[in-house]
Design a protein with these regions (language model features):
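Short glycine/proline-rich turn/loop motifs
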Residues: 64-75, 215-222, 258, 283-284
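Conserved mid-domain beta->alpha element of the FAD-binding
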Residues: 21, 88, 132, 252, ...
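General small-molecule cofactor/ligand-binding pocket signal
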Residues: 31, 98-100, 251-253
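Core beta-strand elements of the Rossmann-like FAD/NAD(P) dinucleotide-binding domain
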Residues: 120-129, 271
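C-terminal helical "tail/cap" subdomain of flavin- and related membrane-associated enzymes
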Residues: 308-426
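Active-site-adjacent segment of FAD-dependent monooxygenases/related oxidoreductases
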Residues: 6-93, 194-197, 206, 336
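A conserved short coil-to-beta-strand element within the FAD-binding core of flavoproteins
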Residues: 101-115
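Conserved FAD-binding catalytic core of PHBH/FMO-like flavoproteins
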Residues: 90, 129, 133-260
Length: 427
């Protein structure tokens, strides 16, 4: 990338992440940009974002909120990842940090006393340590994974990575509309789960003041091709299906297909303790619950001070670096498992409406082309919703029983502790 991505992605900062930010002196800045709780405390399950609700989950009234308040002076916040990252970049602007854009690592040499990173322009960077935070298919991460326990070998880093099967294909759409923001001020929410004849999708209200939203809708290969689903004409059709009336000022900012995976690297570090995996390079998980970015922050916080001590020549520096994988891998494993469970809980709502995911799998077989698939699924949605005289009843039961996707997770957020070779959620 030649510049940071402005595409909205993660948007929930947990209490633990905010505690870390407070320690770094970023607490006041985050509180200034955070929207009020009233705007994002709810999840709405609806036929249109500006239409009728099947049910509303008010997480601000959930027992978990009180548990978090009792455990920490920090509160969960709803802040878009690009906004959070911009704040972090400003915080290090005056530090001894050099940021380069438009460069890619193509090879890494691993040795007992350091690392050498070769860039795509031919330049070589020598360093004591390598932190591979370049995502699940990054070159630096590939080297760490491919090198396994033999850190002395110089392994090309481009073609080495562990793939995991996709749980689901999606298209993510960033769009702006002050018209939509005005319609939603009387019915605010963080997430709008939309179920109607034209679409089954989720809308994230990132910023009502600026009219910034993110739409996530599923794609079902081979009946649908992700690239075609992200094409402008189809994206506009999906956005149009969200509202009762067309938006007067719709602006599509960006659209990109992506794969939802659940993956955990076998190793987070090499035995030489010269190279480490952090964030998505080490683990991928469904966005359900918002653990991806927060787990990455926990990784970075755990590793940063240990690297500082080791680089300064601390006598126990090697032992500290060895503890990174021992502490963070079990923590990440727990969050991956919870995120998968949350994703499955989220499927209870369409099932309550008579739209089980299995029906879409069958539709892929019955309608192997994109046009036929859309026709088949639209007809199925219409038939199911028409048959359900009171479609909200099943959804209300799921929400009233708190079986839907939660927003707060006190045990996983603040209850995690490191205990020797394991990490677990404290009661």
């Amino acid at each position: 990338r030649t510049a940071p991505s402005a595409h909205p992605r993660a948007h929930v900062l947990t209490a633990r992440t905010l505690e870390i930010c407070e320690d770094l002196g970023l607490g006041d800045a985050l509180r200034q940009i955070a929207p009020p709780l009233e705007r994002w405390r709810r999840f709405r399950y609806c036929d249109r974002v500006d239409g009728a609700d099947y049910a509303v989950a008010d997480h601000g009234a959930a027992p978990a909120w009180a548990n978090l308040e009792a455990a920490s002076d920090q509160r969960v916040q709803h802040i878009s990842q690009p906004v959070f990252e911009a704040l972090l970049r400003r915080a290090v602007a005056d530090a001894d940090v050099e940021t380069r854009y438009g460069r890619r690592v193509v090879d890494v040499g691993l040795g007992g006393d350091g690392v050498a990173c070769v860039l795509d322009d031919g330049a070589t960077l020598d360093a004591e340590y390598l932190v591979a935070a370049d995502g699940p298919r990054g070159a630096a991460a590939g080297v760490v994974l491919a090198a396994a326990t033999d850190a002395a070998d110089r392994v090309p880093g481009v073609a080495h990575h562990l793939d995991a099967p996709a749980l689901q294909h999606f298209v993510s759409v960033a769009f702006r509309s002050r018209d939509l923001a005005a319609r939603l001020r009387a019915r605010p929410a963080m997430l709008y789960f939309v179920f109607n004849q034209e679409t089954t999708s989720v809308v994230v209200a990132h910023n009502l003041d600026e009219g910034l939203f993110n739409l996530q809708f599923p794609v079902f290969p081979p009946a649908e091709r992700p690239g075609d689903a992200a094409a402008p004409r189809n994206v506009r059709r999906e956005v149009r299906a969200l509202t009762a009336a067309p938006l007067a000022d719709l602006k599509i900012e960006s659209a990109r297909p992506w794969l939802m995976r659940a993956r955990l690297a076998d190793r987070f570090a090499l035995d030489s303790h010269r190279a480490f995996l952090v964030g998505d390079a080490a683990h991928e998980m469904p966005p359900s619950g918002g653990f991806g970015m927060n787990t990455a922050v926990g990784d970075a916080h755990n590793l940063a001070w240990k690297l500082a001590r080791a680089s300064a020549g601390a006598a126990n520096g090697r032992d500290l670096l060895a503890s990174y994988e021992r502490e963070r891998r079990p923590a990440a494993a727990a969050n991956v498992a919870l995120s998968v469970d949350n994703w499955r809980r989220g499927l209870l709502i369409p099932e309550a409406l008579g739209l089980p995911p299995r029906a879409l799998d069958l539709a892929k077989v019955a309608a192997p082309t994109s046009a036929a698939f859309k026709t088949t699924t639209a007809a199925a949605r219409a038939a199911v919703l028409a048959r359900a005289a009171t479609p909200h009843v099943g959804v209300t039961e799921v929400v009233a029983g708190r079986r839907e996707l939660p927003l707060f997770f006190p045990h996983h957020d603040l209850g995690l502790r490191y205990d020797g070779a394991s990490a677990r959620a404290a009661a």
